[in-house]
Amino acid sequence: IKELMQDHLECLLYGQDVGKRLGGVFREAATLGETFGDERVFNTPIQEAFIIGSTVGMSAVGLKPIVEIQFADYIWPGLNQLFTEVSRSYYLSNGKWPVSCVIRVPTGAYGSGGPYHSSSVESILTNIHGIKIVYPSNAADLKGIMKAAFYDPNPVVILEHKGLYWGKLKGTEETKTIEPSQDYVLPLGKAKSVLLASKEKIEQGKSLCIVTYGMGVYWAKQAAKKFNNQIDILDLRSLYPLDEKYIYEKVKLHSNCIVLSEEPKQNSFAQSL
């Protein structure tokens, strides 16, 4: 975000508690308020409808907002704006008013968040046409995806699992990576393999493909330790657009597949996939 704000004066960052020195309750944007000032990094009222809805007006006058919904659980008051205005503006205006924005959403269960700070919302979001949804599993991917989202003309929602901030949880150490260069951009809609099964196990019919994303990548890696060379792990990185071709190739290769998600199974994105 710092690099984007340095390169683009039209880039703004706002949301609840992101201003001044704090940079969000998870400190992921700490000091940016001090660096760029209150006109470009600022706090908003506790009103998600305003945070999301304001991106329409900001975009219309040539600004490029990066906004934060403090927790995925709080996105519900903003869904009306996301569904009726942000996602449809391009279509309803015949291309005259695209809403180009990045909406960051810390998500997932972490620590003692309880019922109001632990939700996953990807199944709701993937049913909204007109937005793109990404869900990185490590710091390097997040940087590349953030750059791609910023330069994309469409509204992009970035889901960031709270348990992956700082790589503090046991088994998630690989979320901490060497920072890529400033021009590092990852195209949206491209999955990647993070673990490969051996050719021998595949030929024996003893291999399995796990399709997952976000925190699920690390749960899958832990489970794979019990099945030597038998597991292929596919990190989606992008939920929409979805890398259907690569998913199909992997599942066809193994003839066995598990879709791993944190959400309840019934009527979910994972079940649909």
Protein language model features and the residues they cover:
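Thiamine diphosphate
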Residues: 1-159, 162-166, ...
